[in-house]
Amino acid sequence: CCMFVADSVKSVTGIDISEWFRGRYQGRSKAFKLLKEFAQGSVVETMEEITTKYGMKETDPGLLMPGDVVTMKANPLDPIAGRLSNGVTVGIESFTKGSIFSPGKDGLVLSMRPHIYKAWAI
């Protein structure tokens, strides 16, 4: 899930916020092990570390602009990822206000007004 967001940020800004992860894993289990290695935690801790490292400013979820990054409640349709990530995923604000693109079991999921934990402006 994090690589989708990282690729989106790189496309817009030219900055690869996933440089530490890129090419170091294959498959979900290894990805989640790397999250723990990187920030001693889960998706939430990893995003805190990355956004601090790259100077991404936290913003109010109500003020999101297209392309901004969020941590949010994971889509319940992917129980394995939900369990591995403690029910948290990352996503990108779409062009429709209040809707977030995030990776799901079978591709991208568009969530309308999901529960957002934190948001960062790019």
Q: What positions do the PLM features span?
A:
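Short acidic alpha-helical/loop segments enriched in Asp/Glu that coordinate divalent cations
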Residues: 15-25
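Active-site nucleophilic cysteine motif
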Residues: 1-13
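A structural signal for alpha-helix termini and helix-coil/disorder junctions
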Residues: 11, 15, 53-56
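Glycine- and charge-enriched low-complexity intrinsically disordered segments
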Residues: 106-122
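An alpha-helix initiation/capping motif
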Residues: 2-3, 24-26
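...with weaker cross-activation on analogous glycine-rich loops/strands in unrelated enzymes
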Residues: 28-108
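Alpha-helix initiation/capping motif
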Residues: 1-3, 60, 112
